[in-house]
Swiss-Prot record:
Proteolytic cleavage and release of the chaperone in the host cytosol stabilizes the folded protein. Belongs to the S16-like long tail fiber protein Gp37 family. Residues 1243-1340 form the Peptidase S74 domain. The record marks 1243-1244 as: Cleavage. It comes from Enterobacteria phage T2. It is found in: Virion. Its main location: virion. The keyword Zinc-finger does not apply. Homotrimer. Interacts with the receptor-recognizing protein Gp38. This is Long tail fiber protein Gp37. The lineage of its organism: Viruses, Duplodnaviria, Heunggongvirae, Uroviricota, Caudoviricetes. Residues 1238-1241 are annotated as: Interaction with the receptor-recognizing protein gp38. GO terms for cellular component: virus tail, fiber. InterPro entries: Gp34_trimer, S74_ICA. It comes from the Viruses.
Length: 1341
């Protein structure tokens, strides 16, 4: 171990000298002052060199002043930090400099070798820069071997720019913007996103790899028209033609004032003739005609329809002479193979050929029934609200597989044929409501009501038994013929009856009267004739005639012919009806029949039908279950054929086809003027073929216009759309060439080089199956032409003529001035007066001094033709005084000018680049020719140009003078003080505002004002004020001397915390406004809602005692009169250890013992109200339920049971959405049965007056019929129950006071009957019977 003496250094001044081991003890130090080295001896006796030059480890920091030079490798374990203002500089000809071919093996000043990397997913950055919240880096992704510029922010959002090994450059997720020039490439430009440019000049745009949902092109212009300028709101999209001098087609999008937005196509040099338009509501217009499926081998010669049969405006379908043809306004024809087959007019559908309605899937080869409950022909007769069924007339209606016909309407059905009408089989049923009358061919007439003959009854024919009244089989007694009494002149006062009866079959009493013929009236019989039982030994009883009065006769009674009636009337020899024949009470009103088939004229609901019967059911069979050949709507006159497969609606001039349609070969459909085919496509209507791209080749996925090509003749061209221009003897078509499967637009002009004449043109624009497009000639895009030689002309810039652009070069060379300051002749240019431009770029400067950066400058010269007077504008753009400083020009002859520049001495070794417009030329004086001499003086007549200094910081600052500085990029100040703004320069009274960022906070600070004593205060430090600060860690803003907001208010997006004092609104007009917040769901709980409530009072761990905690309120004091009060919102606990708190709304006065009202809201929805609830006006609400009735209603218990006001004075009761009762001013309505223990009707005599007896009560009762019937809730509705009762119309005839008119649930007028009135009628009838019984009893006794 070294002693204290040994710790002292042993010294040596000899270079290279090292102490011997014997000279030093262990740990003793020796120093060589010449070599600056230190030595010691270790415990093994070895001399150790402790200096840095010998290597070793340094565990502390090293601070070095001066240069650092190292010959070997520099291995860096930790980071290397370049302090502010420092940099890493590499001298010229650094490692790796040389040819391209050696760069794979050569290293570089910064070199990373990733050749041994095994993790292919790694990204290896080599340069990285972090700023604010994001980091940029330059590195390599091993899996790609690509060089990437990468950006990632503190949230992990990542973007990158990739330089690929194939020479490509990829931008991830952003755009590639070129603001000062263009992107020029001899190869392809592949863009996965959008390319946005004022103009794109190219050969092909290929979008094969675009993602689903992306557009090929986008032209969403941002035009804004001031004033009324929108009348010219047009976006010009495309202009094309097929050849020079050919038709020019324009495609435009327009949004003009007063018009619908549309896209349209025009012809002409300008927008002269409109061909087609597609409006934003889906409507499409064609100028003339439309041909569909007419393309044949002669292409557009005849494929656009034939004007001979079709006229000028038509829709041709399938062939040139078939389709829809416009005749005149409101009139068009259906044309088939040159012939009109039907005319559609505003008031009719006229068949000009045979009309046949039926259902067939093979064009009439086989006929089938229409669908169940469907008709072949339906007429919309429900327009007159006839309430019969659906109100329509149906012909050929499939009812249960049988063909029926329904004729409906409030009018009448007239049949006016000279030979009358035959119903076969002979069944005719007339139905009205619950009544019906049925007529059978066997003579039977069956009727619910008695048959009434308004104009008498005449029986003709040979049968002697004209009228036969059969004895009832289900009841005692016989039938009576009755003449009712009347009150007019010539009418019988009492009813008169004729009846036949007898008592032979009575159970007891007199049974001798076998046959009695009796004539009587309401006061007794007039006479009767009777045959009594034969006397013993005789078989025929005698005839007795009794007249209850006199018998007067002046002639004879003659009866001829036979009338037989049971339940029908048979007319064997024809029936002649001179007046109107009415059929009512039955749906099947008329039958024409033979033994095999019958046809029935049927009215069903609101339709009239002509329906056949099934085979072999002609006379009495029902309508066919499915066939409905003809239907006429009784309400709208629409005619439906084939179970509405074809419907003609004359009211709306609309023909509806509800089945597949076929136009047979050589026929056509022609569209007339202004007609079109509209393929509907809306959110609810899905057109044929709509779906995915991958489904389009499915033969079952069709389209509004569809052709399925299934041919083997591969040389055939199959067009699907064709247009022929007759005057131009040319045709355009759209179709497929089978041999290639390519879809093409084809143009043919002239004939076939044979019988039709010479061929003039035959061109095809091919959309090929490999995705390519082939044009037969050049492609013109507005003024730009892509020629067949690959050249692009007519564009702007480089694409005015691409070949010329590629042939033109930018010339580069060297230029040198002398050591003398002065003017030099720089160039000679020729610029035509018709406008030309010459540009120069000069790199370099004057002098060669190290770190004189302004000597490495750039100057640019722009020369451009000027007129009036003749000359050129010469502008020199420089960046320092050590470049070209001034410029002058001299016109030497015509359009030739000499150019002079003024520069400093030693302005040499410059690089000059120059170019010119196509019509100009340039010669640089002394280019690559050695040092140029200074000129003695500028020539007389020269013109000094403009010199513009470009703003730069080559001298350390941006010396902009008094110019404004405008930047679109970031303004970065790498200093804590970023900006100082003085109020008045360095003058007295001026002060400054300073923007400062000390890393912890950002401040806006203020200095003191300049004074006479302190004249530089505005340039000094800030004073003690801290008016504004932003905490850089949490973003909080500090206002340390108050905040005055004089306009605009204070908008707070986050929270506003007031830690002390009150927040006061200035006056009564001040208010707190909370702007819109995001919506919250009802499922959000209180913890979620805490962050969503606009005005939030967080009471924290609130006690559940019965203490009251106000949240928000208002205080008012009504002047000197007192009335101090508060209006508050708060809550109160329930007073228990656990439980929900209740919400409180309270209004409180200034009296300690009262003047208080509290409304309490609990968690179960209960409202505890201290007083009554007044609802002056409210909508629907529910009691213990939601409200499903809507309108003005209250529901109870469930959402569709309650009370609803359905109109003025109308209050309805609903049960499960069904209306069961109505209260109104007048009658009360019950739509269901009323069950009650008893019903009491007010009948107090004190309420009654003007008493009158019910006369002839028994006769009135005998005119009534008790019937069993099915009853509906409203007229036209389905029967809902079976009842027994009487018919109101019949009761009205005998006792009008018992019948009252009211409305059903649909508002239809209906008749109701009074049970009380019926009881009164029956009481009087019983009294009459009782009197007669007593009379008979007295006679018998």
């Amino acid at each position: 171990m070294a002693t204290l003496k040994q710790i002292q250094f042993k010294r040596s001044k000899t270079a290279g000298a090292r102490p011997a081991a014997s000279v030093l003890a262990e740990g003793e130090l020796a120093i060589n002052l010449k070599d600056r080295t230190i030595f010691t001896k270790d415990d093994s006796g070895n001399i150790i060199d402790l200096s840095i030059s010998a290597g070793g480890n340094i565990s502390g920091n090293i601070t070095q002043t001066g240069d650092y030079t190292q010959t070997g490798k520099f291995n860096l374990i930790g980071p290397q930090i370049v302090a502010s203002g420092g940099y890493i500089e590499f001298n010229y000809r650094t490692t790796g400099s040389g040819a391209w071919s050696g760069q794979h093996t050569a290293k570089a000043p910064i070199f990373v070798d990733l050749s041994s990397a095994t993790s292919t997913s790694e990204y290896n950055p080599i340069i990285k820069q972090r700023f604010k919240d994001g980091t940029f880096s330059l590195g390599t992704l091993v899996s790609e071997g690509s060089l990437k510029i990468h950006y990632i922010n503190e949230s992990g959002d990542s973007k990158y720019w990739t330089f690929r090994r194939d020479g490509g450059f990829t931008v991830d997720g952003g755009g590639l913007g070129v603001s000062g020039g263009s992107i020029t490439t001899s190869g392809n430009i592949a863009a996965l996103g959008n390319i946005t440019s004022p103009q794109i000049n190219t050969k092909n745009i290929i979008l094969d790899t675009k993602a689903f949902g992306q557009y090929d092109s986008q032209s969403l212009v941002q035009y804004v028209y001031p004033g009324t300028g929108e009348e010219n709101g047009i976006n010009y999209l495309r202009k094309v033609r097929a050849k020079s001098g050919g038709t020019i087609y324009h495609e435009i999008a327009s949004a003009q004032t007063g018009k619908n937005d549309e896209i349209s196509w025009w012809t002409g040099n300008t927008l002269t003739t409109k061909l087609m338009g597609l409006r934003n509501d889906g409507a499409m217009v064609l100028r003339r005609s439309l041909a569909i499926g007419t393309i044949t081998a002669d292409e557009n010669t005849n494929n656009y329809g034939s004007p001979t049969p079709m006229g000028e405006r038509y829709i041709a379908l399938g062939d040139a002479a078939t389709g829809l043809k416009y005749i005149k306004q409101g009139v068009y024809d259906l044309v088939g193979n040159w012939n009109s087959v039907a005319s559609i007019t505003p008031d009719s559908f006229r068949s000009t050929r045979k009309a046949l309605f039926g259902r067939s899937e093979d064009q009439g080869g086989t006929w089938t029934m229409p669908g169940t409950n469907a008709a072949l022909l339906s007429v919309q007769t429900q327009a007159d609200v006839n309430n019969a069924g659906d109100g329509q007339t149906h012909i050929g209606y499939n009812s249960g597989g049988k063909m029926s016909h329904y004729f409906r309407g409030k009018g009448q059905t007239n049949i006016n044929t000279q030979k009358g009408m035959e119903v076969n089989p002979g069944i005719l049923k007339l139905v009205t409501d619950s009544n019906n009358v049925q007529f059978y061919a066997n003579g039977t007439v069956s009727s619910i009501q008695r048959i009434k003959f308004d104009n008498g009854l005449v029986l003709t024919g040979a049968r002697p038994d004209g009228i036969q009244l059969d004895a009832p089989t289900a009841a005692d007694g016989t039938k009576t013929i009755l003449w009712a009494g009347g009150t007019r002149a010539g009418q019988n006062k009492s009813y008169v009856s004729i009846k036949a009866w007898g008592n032979s079959f009575n159970a007891s009493g007199d049974r001798a009267r076998e046959t009695v013929f009796e004539v009587g009236d309401g006061q007794g019989f007039h006479f009767y004739s009777q045959r009594v039982a034969p006397a013993p030994g005789s078989t025929v009883g005698p005839i007795q005639l009794r007249v209850n009065g006199g018998l007067l006769t002046a002639g004879s009674i003659v009866a001829s012919g036979s009338i037989t009636t049971e339940s029908s009337l048979n007319v064997n020899n024809g029936l002649s009806v001179n007046g109107q024949a009415k059929f009512g009470g039955t749906a099947n009103a008329l039958r024409i029949w033979n033994a095999e088939y019958g046809v029935i004229f049927r009215r069903s609901e609101s339709n009239f039908y002509i329906i056949p019967t099934n085979q072999n059911e002609g006379e009495s069979g029902d309508i066919h279950s499915s066939l409905r050949p003809v239907r006429i709507g009784l309400n709208d006159g629409a005619v439906g054929l084939g179970r509405d497969s074809f419907i003609v609606d004359q009211n709306n001039a609309l023909t509806t086809i509800n089945s597949n349609s076929r136009i047979n070969a050589n026929f056509r459909m022609q569209l007339g003027q202004s007609t079109y085919i509209d393929a509907e496509c809306t959110d609810t209507v899905r057109p044929a073929g709509a779906g995915s791209f991958v489904s389009q080749n499915n033969e079952n996925v069709r389209a509004p216009f569809y052709m399925n090509i299934n041919r083997t003749d591969t040389s055939t061209y199959v067009p699907i759309l064709k247009q022929r221009y007759v005057q131009g003897n040319s045709c355009y078509s759209l179709g497929t060439l089978i041999s290639t499967g390519d879809f093409r637009i084809h143009y043919h002009e002239g004939g076939d080089n044979g019988s039709t004449g010479p061929q003039k043109a035959d061109l095809a624009w091919q959309f090929r199956r490999d995705g390519s497009f082939r044009s037969p000639n050049k492609i013109e895009i507005n003024a730009v032409t892509i020629g067949t030689d690959g050249n692009i002309t007519g564009g702007t810039g480089n694409f005015a003529n691409l070949n010329t652009t590629l042939n033109r070069k930018t010339t580069v060379g060297g230029w040198a001035g002398s050591s003398v300051v002065g003017w030099y002749k720089f160039a000679t240019v020729t610029i035509p007066q018709s406008t030309g431009t010459v540009t120069f770029k000069i790199s370099g400067g004057a002098g060669f001094n190290f770190k004189s950066y302004n000597q490495a400058s750039i100057a640019e010269i722009v020369l451009r033709t000027g007129n009036n007077p003749k000359g050129i504008n010469a502008v020199l753009w420089n960046r320092s005084d050590l470049s070209f400083n001034q410029i002058a020009t001299m016109n030497t002859s015509d359009d030739t000018y000499d150019v002079y520049v003024f520069c400093e001495g030693y302005t040499n070794a410059l690089i000059v680049e120059y170019s010119c417009s196509e019509n100009s030329s340039v010669t640089v004086v002394g280019l690559n020719g050695g040092i140029q001499p200074v000129v003695d003086a500028l020539p007389e007549g020269h013109v000094v140009g403009k010199t513009v200094r470009l703003l730069n910081n080559i001298g350390g600052t941006f010396a902009a003078g008094e110019s404004d500085i405008v930047t679109r990029g970031e303004y970065v100040a790498d200093n804590q003080k970023g900006m100082r703004i003085k109020s008045n320069g360095n003058n007295i009274g001026s002060n400054a505002a300073i923007l400062r960022n000390d890393g912890g906070s950002f401040y806006i600070l203020a200095t003191d004002k300049n004074t006479a004593e302190k004249s530089d205060a505005a340039n000094g430090d800030w004073n003690g004020l801290r008016p504004f600060a932003i905490n850089m860690a949490d973003g909080r803003v500090g206002m340390n001397h108050g905040l005055n907001i004089t306009g605009g208010g204070l908008n707070v997006t986050g929270g506003l915390n007031v830690t002390s004092g009150n927040t006061s609104l200035g006056n009564i007009s001040s208010r707190v406004v909370a702007r819109w917040r995001g919506a919250s769901g009802w499922a959000d709980n209180s913890d979620t809602m805490k962050s969503k409530i606009t005005f939030m009072a967080d009471h924290g761990d609130l006690s559940n005692s019965d203490s009251y905690y106000p949240i928000v309120g208002a205080y008012s004091n009504y002047g000197s009169a007192g009335y101090r009060q508060t209006f508050e919102f708060g809550w109160v606990g329930s007073g228990t250890t656990a439980g929900w708190r209740d919400g409180i709304i309270r209004i409180r006065g200034d009296n300690a013992n009262g003047q208080q009202a509290r409304w309490r809201f609990t968690m179960d929805g209960t409202l505890d109200c201290p007083g009554k609830v007044l609802l002056p006006q409210t909508g629907a609400f529910g009691v213990n339920t939601s409200n499903g009735l809507g309108g003005n209603s209250i529901t109870f218990g469930d959402s569709d049971t309650g009370i609803k006001q359905n109109g003025d004075g109308l209050l309805d009761i609903y049960a499960n959405s069904v209306q069961v009762f109505r209260f109104q001013n007048g009658d009360l309505y019950s739509y269901k049965n009323i069950n009650a223990p008893n019903v009491y009707i007010r009948s107090d005599i004190r309420l009654k007056s003007n008493f009158k007896p019910i006369e002839n009560a028994l006769d009135k009762v005998e005119k009534l019929n008790g019937v069993i019937y099915d009853k509906a809730e409203y007229i036209g509705g389905e029967a809902i129950e079976t009842e027994a009762g009487i018919v109101a119309q019949t009761l009205q005839d005998v006792l009008p006071e018992a019948v009252r008119e009211t409305e059903d649930s649909k508002g239809n007028k209906i008749l109701t009957v009074s049970s009380q009135a019926q009881i009164a009628l029956l009481v009087e009838a019983v009294k009459t019977l009782s009197a007669r019984v007593k009379e008979l009893e007295s006679k018998l006794m």
